[in-house]
Amino acid sequence: MQITFLGTSSGVPTRSRNVSALALRLPQRSELWLFDCGEGTQHQFLRSDLRTSQLKKIFITHMHGDHIYGLPGLMASLGLAGNSLGLDLYGPSALKGFLDGILKSSSSRISYPMKIHGLELESAENKIIFEDNDFLVTCTPLIHRVPAFAYRVDEKAKPGRFDVEKAKALRIPPGPIYSQLQKGQIVKLKDGRIFNGNDFCGPQRKGASFVYCTDTMFAQTALKLANGADLLIHEATFSHEDSDLAYQRQHSTSTMAAQIASEANVGQLVLTHLSPRYAPGNRISPNDLLSEAKSIFPNTLLAKDFLQIEIQKHATVRDT
């Protein structure tokens, strides 16, 4: 799994940072999943190596403009481009009314299948919102001025390495039987011998995981969702010095994000959603926020637009 940041600013865009959006690339299935879609996101796609034709799912954290104003334009453009994949959208229950109103009033034609999955705060804690053979997506409510949700994506464990030499030594004929054994299935050969696939496979290979957490102040729900994740992407709107503002506006400081990362025992933390007040050259700069976070959680990076991160697995196993 690979992350591409398409927008890392809070509230309004700057010359170097667009507002919130990030893409998750799933090369094994030629799909893209988008998390938030601030104004100008489709322009950011054009400046990246990502293809909107692969876009399959969009996850919206909350209904503030810097996270959703790019959505109607992107959806309309997908229709004009003849997107045939269809689109699933996940987000607060108000998302449907927002899109219905804009698309209807602008006479925008959505020519592809679209389904909106509305989320409610009361029933969303650690809620599974999508699952298939490869991935599990979970959400949880956050603490913000409007209903907001964090998302976690877990890649399911893969079968362990198949011992081909052992199978050959036992004169098991190659072909579809090897595939069955690799999946852990019990196979009966024509000569009557029975083999358990688990006897030919090493330990399961843990899948990668990441959590996207914005907008929120420090939240126990976020801590629980992030437990053991390989990568935590967490908002850091304010510096520790401006923690009073963070509490007033229900945002996080860099140190709050680092505290979540440390207590959740994640592999890596990336700070995003930075206030424009911390532009380079100002008294407090983005690098100062990074230093604050690293004093608590050393394996921290500062997001910037078009930064790409290959999610690296670490040994921690999430509690269930």
UniProtKB/Swiss-Prot annotation:
Keywords: Endonuclease, Hydrolase, Metal-binding, Nuclease, tRNA processing, Zinc
Active site: 66
Known EC number: 3.1.26.11
GO terms assigned for molecular function: 3'-tRNA processing endoribonuclease activity; zinc ion binding
Cofactor: Zn(2+)
CDD domains named among the record's database cross-references: RNaseZ_ZiPD-like_MBL-fold
Cystine crosslinks: none
Residues noted as binding Zn(2+) 2 in the record, renumbered to the chain: 66-67, 215, 273
InterPro entries for the chain: Metallo-B-lactamas (IPR001279), RibonucZ/Hydroxyglut_hydro (IPR036866), RNase_Z/BN (IPR013471)
Reactions it catalyzes: Endonucleolytic cleavage of RNA, removing extra 3' nucleotides from tRNA precursor, generating 3' termini of tRNAs. A 3'-hydroxy group is left at the tRNA terminus and a 5'-phosphoryl group is left at the trailer molecule
Transmembrane feature ranges: none
Class in the EC hierarchy, top level: hydrolase
Cofactor note: Binds 2 Zn(2+) ions.
One Pfam family of this chain: Lactamase_B_2
SUPFAM superfamilies: Metallo-hydrolase/oxidoreductase
Record-listed Zn(2+) 1 binding positions: 62, 64, 144, 215
Similarity comment: Belongs to the RNase Z family.
Described purpose of this protein according to its UniProt entry: Zinc phosphodiesterase, which displays some tRNA 3'-processing endonuclease activity. Probably involved in tRNA maturation, by removing a 3'-trailer from precursor tRNA.
HAMAP family for this protein: RNase_Z_BN
Oligomeric form and interacting partners: Homodimer.
Protein's name according to its UniProt entry: Ribonuclease Z
Organism: Prochlorococcus marinus (strain SARG / CCMP1375 / SS120)
